[in-house]
């Protein structure tokens, strides 16, 4: 669908210069001289590079609609991650580097959302929060309760995060998969 350059909003996926880009930031600029334009910071969906572009109001760009499908993670085979389409039961194989460091959070049976463009996967979304076990954590030092302090810990999947001093090895915690940060203990209600 064609849209004007001044209609681009954050989160829109557009086709520009032969690639797919997602708009991150948009700033409408009205200079004293000349016509108004939309300053757009974009990220390439294929290789992750960032790019700034000015779009005049009269310019048109192709806005792309991505298909989103739910897949269930089945297993890992070497560097390949095997997923199953929840509707058609077809299997999809993605390379581990396609998912990035968040691949360590994949668990058997976990539902993920894969973004497809012309039947080709271009992005994957894991659940925002997952429960994992702390494999190693330094013991808490006395007197560390006055200020908000954190200590390093290693999760069962090998990811390093910072946790509060009261968290010990063997405890289950909730981790934000986007920011890779500790949120709370897994048995907490909040």
Curated annotation (Swiss-Prot):
One of the record's GO cellular component terms: cytoplasm
GO molecular function, one term: translation elongation factor activity
Keywords: Cytoplasm, Elongation factor, Protein biosynthesis
Major localization listed first in the record, in broad terms: cytoplasm
SUPFAM superfamilies tied to this protein: Nucleic acid-binding proteins (SSF50249), Translation proteins SH3-like domain (SSF50104)
CDD domains linked to this entry: S1_EF-P_repeat_1, S1_EF-P_repeat_2
Pathway: Protein biosynthesis; polypeptide chain elongation
Pfam families linked to this entry: EFP, EFP_N, Elong-fact-P_C
Domain of life: Bacteria
Localisation: Cytoplasm
GO BP annotations, alphabetical order: peptide biosynthetic process
InterPro entries, per the entry: Elong-fact-P_C, NA-bd_OB-fold, Rib_uL2_dom2, Transl_elong_fac_P/YeiP, Transl_elong_KOW-like, Transl_elong_P/YeiP_cen, Transl_elong_P/YeiP_CS, Transl_elongation_fac_P
PANTHER family: ELONGATION FACTOR P, TRANSLATION ELONGATION FACTOR KOW-LIKE DOMAIN-CONTAINING PROTEIN
Homology family: Belongs to the elongation factor P family.
NCBIfam families: efp, PRK00529.1
Function: Involved in peptide bond synthesis. Stimulates efficient translation and peptide-bond synthesis on native or reconstituted 70S ribosomes in vitro. Probably functions indirectly by altering the affinity of the ribosome for aminoacyl-tRNA, thus increasing their reactivity as acceptors for peptidyl transferase.
Name of the protein this chain belongs to: Elongation factor P
Organism lineage: Bacteria, Pseudomonadati, Pseudomonadota, Alphaproteobacteria, Hyphomicrobiales
């Amino acid at each position: 669908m064609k849209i004007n350059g001044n209609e681009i909003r954050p989160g829109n996926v557009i086709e520009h210069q032969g690639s797919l880009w997602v708009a991150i930031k948009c700033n409408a600029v009205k200079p004293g001289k000349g016509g108004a334009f939309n300053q757009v910071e974009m990220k390439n969906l294929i290789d992750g590079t960032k790019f700034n572009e000015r779009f005049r109001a009269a310019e048109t760009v192709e806005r792309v609609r991505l298909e989103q499908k739910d897949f269930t993670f089945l297993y890992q085979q070497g560097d390949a991650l095997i997923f199953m389409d929840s509707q058609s039961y077809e299997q999809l194989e993605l390379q581990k580097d396609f998912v990035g460091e968040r691949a360590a959070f994949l668990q058997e049976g976990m539902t993920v959302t894969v973004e497809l463009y012309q039947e080709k996967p271009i992005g994957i979304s894991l659940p925002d929060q997952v429960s994992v076990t702390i494999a190693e954590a330094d013991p808490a030092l006395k007197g560390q309760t006055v200020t908000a302090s954190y200590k390093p810990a290693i999760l069962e999947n090998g990811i390093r995060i910072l946790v509060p001093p009261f968290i010990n090895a063997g405890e289950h915690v909730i981790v934000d998969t986007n920011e890779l940060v500790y949120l709370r203990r897994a048995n907490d209600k909040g």
